[in-house]
Design a protein with these regions (language model features):
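Anionic coordination/interaction segments
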Residues: 1-190
Length: 190
């Protein structure tokens, strides 16, 4: 007999889901998709740059990145275990407020602290060239999709792009706070 777990009056929604992998074409590129990657233990990846940029990232979003070497990193240059542990305070951070039926609902995609409040699907995509990595979370309750991608540019260096999509036919009022955190000041060694 399986009983629901509650946090206050909110039932947590965290049934285990099967991890699946597949190739697909997206945005003119070929990607490998890992569906429900959050069910796996965090794993480490690197992105390939055509110049002197580098980026090491965990599947939970924690990362370090920079140019040339560790002494010119944008984020603290730590060992992989510390990068994995630091995902909540280093790298991408998104907080979304949705006005729905006179309620203001808070959603923080990819955060371990918000897991179970909503029914979600999480997918990870890495292109076959190894220079693009996309995180995607679909909130089935709010009918919203949020995704962000890391890549490189000769002109701009390390890039992060983000998207939000309304999957419902109903118009929504959404407030979104998005950015990166724990950036090192220029000239500070790690």
């Amino acid at each position: 007999m399986s009983k629901a777990i509650y946090l206050g009056k909110q039932a947590l929604q965290n049934p285990p889901k099967a991890v699946e992998g597949s190739f697909l074409s997206m945005d003119g590129d070929r990607f490998y998709k890992i569906a429900n990657y959050q069910e796996m233990k965090p794993f480490f990846m690197s992105l390939v740059s055509p110049s002197d940029h580098w980026l090491f990232i965990s599947s939970n979003g924690g990362l370090t990145a920079g140019r040339v070497n560790a002494e010119s990193s944008l984020f603290p240059y730590y060992t992989d275990d510390k990068i994995i542990d630091g995902a909540e305070y280093t790298g991408a951070k998104t907080i979304i407020r949705v006005l729905q039926e006179d309620q203001l609902l808070l959603w923080e995609p990819f955060s371990k602290y918000g897991k179970g409040f909503y029914s979600t699907e999480s997918n990870l995509y890495k292109n076959t060239h190894g220079n693009r990595l996309r995180f995607e979370e679909i909130n089935l309750d709010l009918k919203l999709r949020f995704a962000y991608e890391w890549s490189f540019s000769d002109r701009f260096g390390i890039l992060r792009q983000a998207w939000i999509e309304n999957l419902d036919d109903v118009e929504r009022s959404i407030e979104l706070l998005d950015g990166i955190q724990n950036i090192l000041p220029a000239g500070v060694g790690s």
